[in-house]
């Protein structure tokens, strides 16, 4: 059975009775009309009153408010998702600001840690290494025939929480919920996948409730061959799918991206999505301060695949603004646990090599340290922008922030590590230490901060501003690849929707209530660039806009007609 996004067409449904009520994509619960109850053998299986979806959503909202902890709210919402997806997305849409942190970061981190404990019902595909010889059969078992977006993880680097084994499935489920909520992609077109390649988390291996393969992680050639077999099977089943890599370990994330980005329509959200939203935020923050990104000096704390991916996108944007690549690289400084990345450092990873600073150019620095700390770098570089992707809490100390503020009246500080327990500094501290003069954007949601009687909204530099629009743009345009230029177009479009840029004040990023508008705009920009680059069929702007509108799913019930299987 094919699901269509065409809103005014009736759906022809072969299921009836209790089977239909157990089908989350089709179940309406108490909203089935009397005619549908008669036609689909539902008479007597539901209470008498026929409700609207808004009446159902109001009851769900009242029930939601009865839960006291965020994890209990998460479990409740996931139960609705697994019972009635249309109602789930209507409820989320009605209370987006309240519920987005519950269905995704930061609450999803706890849900991943407790996945086997709170497990209720299967969702998505669990591909175990033990079943590596049955990949085609596994994918044929998926009821969604027209899958257009897949989010896949192997659970090894879940947020800042490390190896969660199959508990990492919470991330693809949550991520795809945002593709639908923010980007209008029908849930019938989405598929979460976790690769169960074992776990090195001893706590999970010892947990009698753990539901994954109790085995140390496979590695090296064995691992890469398995991933390749899975991707080839996905290509055979859904050749035009958009595949998003999510929360793979640093040692695997970049190699997998480089290996497959020109073989299948794919991207890594931790590397490219984080980079795109960060660059968009920095463009907006720079313009809000009356300058360009190319005029800034940028220091990173964290030089893993995500940090280096952001740095490379920043460098590309600086080059777009007129500097040479060499000049751009001299404005970006990467600090990891061993200090500033410099030439001659041992054990640098391949993606770090182009981001080192030359030791000979640091001879005038005011320091005697061999390993240059974050404080050394801030004191000597005098940066305008400080970005944290370290996954380690509290490393943006008062001394470091005050040192930065001493040389920069409006510092841009972005502690991006997730979840909130891993943030490099809280917005409250950053703004207090800078007398409210810092521009702050975080990776996790934070409430507004009050300093000296003035309230400051905190922009959440969340990838959900970017990846839903990219997904919608790829689907609407039929793009066969996700290129760097498409990602840069997404960044620029996000910056154009900044209240700070457009109004001269307010948050750096748009409000969540406007995220669907932003996603549509990003989809158009991404689709247009895809056409210009030849990775999508060229159409008129009007046709592309119509395709975006046609593919934008809304959580509304459709009329059902009965048919045979």
UniProtKB/Swiss-Prot annotation:
UniProt-annotated catalytic positions: 104, 175
Cofactors required: Mg(2+); Mn(2+)
Binding positions (a divalent metal cation): 246-247, 270
Molecular function terms from GO: malate dehydrogenase (decarboxylating) (NAD+) activity; metal ion binding; NAD binding; oxaloacetate decarboxylase activity
InterPro entries for the chain: Aminoacid_DH-like_N_sf, Malic_enzyme_CS, Malic_N_dom, Malic_N_dom_sf, Malic_NAD-bd, Malic_OxRdtase, NAD(P)-bd_dom_sf, NAD_malic_enz_proteobac
Catalytic activity field: (S)-malate + NAD(+) = pyruvate + CO2 + NADH; oxaloacetate + H(+) = pyruvate + CO2
EC numbers on record: 1.1.1.38
Site (Important for activity): 270
GO cellular component: cytosol
GO biological process: malate metabolic process
Residues at which NAD(+) binds: 157, 270, 418
Keyword Cytoplasm included in the entry's annotation: no
Enzyme class: oxidoreductase
Protein's UniProt keywords contain NAD: yes
Subunit structure, interactors included: Homotetramer.
HAMAP family: NAD_malic_enz (MF_01619)
Family: Belongs to the malic enzymes family.
Name the record gives this protein: NAD-dependent malic enzyme
Species this chain originates from: Klebsiella pneumoniae subsp. pneumoniae (strain ATCC 700721 / MGH 78578)
Lineage: Bacteria, Pseudomonadati, Pseudomonadota, Gammaproteobacteria, Enterobacterales
């Amino acid at each position: 059975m094919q699901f269509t996004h065409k809103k005014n067409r009736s759906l022809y449904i072969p299921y009836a009775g209790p089977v239909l009520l157990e089908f989350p994509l089709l179940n309406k619960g108490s909203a089935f009309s009397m005619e549908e109850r008669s036609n689909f053998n539902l008479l007597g299986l539901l209470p008498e009153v026929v409700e609207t979806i808004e009446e159902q959503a109001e009851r769900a909202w009242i029930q939601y408010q009865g839960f006291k902890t965020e994890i209990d709210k998460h479990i409740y919402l996931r139960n609705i998702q697994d019972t009635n997806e249309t109602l789930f997305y209507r409820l989320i849409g009605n209370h987006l600001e309240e519920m987005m942190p519950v269905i995704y970061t930061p609450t999803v981190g706890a849900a991943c840690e407790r996945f086997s404990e709170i497990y209720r019902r299967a969702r998505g595909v669990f591909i175990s290494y033990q079943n590596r010889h049955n990949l085609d059969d596994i994918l044929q078992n998926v009821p969604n025939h027209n899958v257009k977006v897949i989010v896949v993880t192997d659970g090894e680097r879940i947020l800042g929480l490390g190896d969660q084994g199959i508990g990492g499935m919470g991330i693809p489920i949550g991520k795809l919920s945002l593709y639908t909520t923010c980007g209008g992609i029908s849930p019938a077109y989405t598929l979460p996948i976790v690769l169960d390649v074992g776990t090195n988390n001893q706590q999970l291996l010892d947990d009698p409730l753990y539901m994954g393969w109790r085995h140390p992680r496979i590695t090296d050639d064995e691992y890469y061959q398995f991933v390749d077999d899975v991707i080839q099977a996905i290509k055979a089943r859904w050749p035009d799918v958009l595949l998003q890599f999510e929360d793979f370990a640093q040692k695997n994330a970049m190699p997998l991206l480089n290996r497959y980005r020109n073989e299948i329509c794919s991207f890594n959200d931790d590397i490219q999505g984080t980079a795109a939203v960060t660059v968009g935020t920095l463009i907006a923050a720079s313009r809000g301060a009356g300058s360009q990104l190319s005029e800034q000096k940028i220091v990173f704390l964290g030089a893993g695949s995500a940090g280096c991916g952001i740095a490379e996108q920043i460098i590309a944007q600086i080059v777009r603004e007129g500097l040479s690549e060499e000049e751009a690289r001299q404005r970006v400084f990467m600090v990891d646990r061993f200090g500033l990345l410099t030439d001659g450092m041992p054990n640098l990873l391949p993606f770090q090599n182009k981001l080192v600073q030359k030791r000979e150019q640091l001879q005038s620095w005011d320091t005697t340290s061999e390993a240059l700390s974050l404080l050394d770098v801030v004191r000597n570089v005098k940066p305008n922008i400080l970005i944290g992707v370290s996954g380690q809490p509290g490393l943006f100390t008062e001394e470091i922030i005050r040192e930065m503020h001493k040389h920069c009246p409006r510092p841009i500080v972005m502690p991006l590590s997730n979840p909130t327990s891993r943030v490099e500094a809280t917005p409250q501290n950053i703004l207090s230490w800078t007398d409210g003069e810092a521009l702050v954007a975080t990776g996790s949601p934070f409430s507004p901060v009050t300093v000296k009687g003035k309230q400051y909204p905190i922009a959440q530099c969340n990838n959900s501003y970017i990846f839903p629009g990219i997904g919608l743009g790829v689907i609407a345009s039929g793009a066969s690849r996700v290129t760097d230029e498409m990602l840069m177009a997404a960044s620029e479009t996000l910056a154009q929707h900044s209240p700070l840029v457009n109004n001269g004040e307010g948050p750096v990023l748009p409000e969540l209530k406007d995220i669907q508008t932003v996603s549509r705009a990003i989809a158009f920009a991404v689709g247009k660039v895809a056409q210009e680059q030849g990775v999508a069929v060229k159409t008129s702007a009007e046709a592309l806009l119509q395709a975006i509108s046609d593919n934008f799913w809304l959580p509304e019930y459709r009329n059902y007609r009965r048919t045979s299987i």
